[in-house]
Structure formats: C-alpha cells, structure tokens
Amino acid sequence: FPQGIMAQLARTAAAGQPGILSHVGLGTFIDPRVSGGKLNEVSQEDLIRVMNVDGKEWLYYPVVPLDVCLIRATTADTEGYASMEEEITYIDVLQLAQAVHNNGGTVILQVKRLVKAGTLHPKSVKIPGFLVDAIVVEEKQEQLYNGSDRFFSGDYIADDSAVTMLPLDQRKVVARRALMEVRPGYVGNVGVGIADGIGNVAREEGVQDAFTLTVETGPVGGATAQGIFFGATVNARAVMDMPAQFDFYDG
C-alpha cells in the first residue's frame, strides 16, 4: 500500500472502520486493473478494489488488523504516558497504538527515561498511558545510528553560518532546476532522492522563506536532511502527525 494510505489506515483501524476510499493509486501499479501492488505471481488475492461512488472511481483499501506494535518516545511516566521531545517526528505512533489497543493487541513502548506519574506536561504527552501494555527503558536510546541530533529534534536552530554548500554536481544541478519551478507561496512535498537537496539550494540562494517545503513524515518548513537522514528537517516550523500530513497532500 502507499505510504500515506498505510498511515491513514492505522487511524481508520483505530476507529473500527473497515477501510479507506481514496483516489491515491488510481491508474498506477496499485490499481488492481494494473497489478494491484502485487510483487510477483505468488500473490493472487486482490486486496484493493475499484469502487464507484456517485459516478466517481475510488480505490478501496481494507484495514489490516494489527496485533502488536513497538513504538518509541523519549520520556514516559510510570503509568505509560509518554512525550517525544527528542524524536525527529511523531509519524503515526499514536494511531498505531490506538489501532493495536482497540484490536486487543499489545503495545510496547521504548523510552529513554522514566519519571513519576503525573509529572509530564499534558500538552507534551503524545501517547496516553492507557494504550501502553509494556515499557522498555533504554538509557542510551539513540535517535539515529550515529546518535541523537538536537537540530533534527528542533531543540537547536541552525543559522546561515551552518549552511553547507552542496558540491556542484549532477544532483545539485537537478535540485536547482527543480527550485526554479517553485513560486512564492507554494507548499511542496519533498520526496526522497535528488529532491532532498532543494531546501539546501534554496538556503544557499536565500529564498528559503518564499515557500514552504514539507516531508511526508510530518515536518513543515525548514531544510530537509539528505541521504540516510532523509525524513528529518533542520529549522522546521511545525511537525505534524504523518496521517494529517497525507490528508493535506491527498486533498
């Protein structure tokens, strides 16, 4: 299933709904009239269906019941209420926890530290404790394979002196050409690959404030991280839940 559909399906499953009707995937390899997302001939069952509602075609994606989820936050109190202050994004951890809990499954939460019950600021809590079945404390919890990055988590702001000039190669030329298509006031989605350099080139040119770049994982604004760190953003203006981010894209 497409990334956004999977994120939205977690929310749909949590609500006890059967599936999602979406225009996403029509006419692509996800469309059952093409290949239905099947990788090879071993997969025979059509999981996705074409449906007509009021004369318009939609793809129907059924909910896949979830039994277990392993999610990560930064701090949890002894009753399982958890905050995510050192995480890069919230992605769909809340929706997954709700979906698994409401399906009678097991929600396992990994955190860096444990604090006394009721001491977390309520607006910082992203996962309510009644959804959590088990807590694992890992004090050396690393955000990335090379350790946490407080710029990615939004604790630090990078000024212009921190901007690294990208080498003038094919990737930069393509990113610069793509930047030329962006108009003031645009809101864009930056995908993985060469597109991850657009934000950096915009900062080099001093035009980063003329438009807003977003990433599927939730960041809004700022400059996207590149390569294996893609999905993170430096100087993000906001961080959305991933299902909400895709709601905006799809609409």
Identify the residue ranges that each predicted region occupies:
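Conserved alpha/beta enzyme-core scaffold
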Residues: 1-251
